[in-house]
Amino acid sequence: MSDNLSQADILARVAATLESRKPENGGDPEKSYVAKLFKKGDDAILKKIGEEATETVMAAKDARAADLADEAVSKVVYEVADLWFHTMVLLARIGRTPEDVVNELARREGLSGLVEKASRKE
């Protein structure tokens, strides 16, 4: 990570890039993987998130089986990055940003997980 960019800056830059890849913003599915996902629609994006979530779970299981060897843990980080990226594509698709997720995490910070879960509307 660049010394001049914060983690929030990087998320914001990725979000801006995703926004620019939307068809209504000139994203070209012939030149951009993300534009192609947007063109294919929600089901393609959700399928990709499911695939990346499964790959993350499998990498985590492999890392544990490898006694958390550096290479195996690096694979988990790699897969989580793919998962985050594709969930960011979904967020862009529904008009939200990583900032919205960070705000939700900030709202939950310090709350008991049980209290937070009980407060959810069914």
Curated annotation (Swiss-Prot):
Keywords of the record: Amino-acid biosynthesis, ATP-binding, Cytoplasm, Histidine biosynthesis, Hydrolase, Nucleotide-binding
Localization terms from the record: Cytoplasm
Hydrolase found in the keyword field: yes
Top-level lineage group: Bacteria
Metabolic or biological pathway, per its Swiss-Prot or TrEMBL entry: Amino-acid biosynthesis; L-histidine biosynthesis; L-histidine from 5-phospho-alpha-D-ribose 1-diphosphate: step 2/9
Any one GO BP annotation for this protein: L-histidine biosynthetic process
GO molecular function: ATP binding; phosphoribosyl-ATP diphosphatase activity
The EC number(s) this enzyme carries: 3.6.1.31
Annotated TM spans: none
Catalyses which reaction(s): 1-(5-phospho-beta-D-ribosyl)-ATP + H2O = 1-(5-phospho-beta-D-ribosyl)-5'-AMP + diphosphate + H(+)
GO CC field: cytoplasm
InterPro entries cross-referenced by the UniProt entry: HisE, PRib-ATP_PPHydrolase-like
Family under the similarity heading: Belongs to the PRA-PH family.
Official protein name in the record: Phosphoribosyl-ATP pyrophosphatase
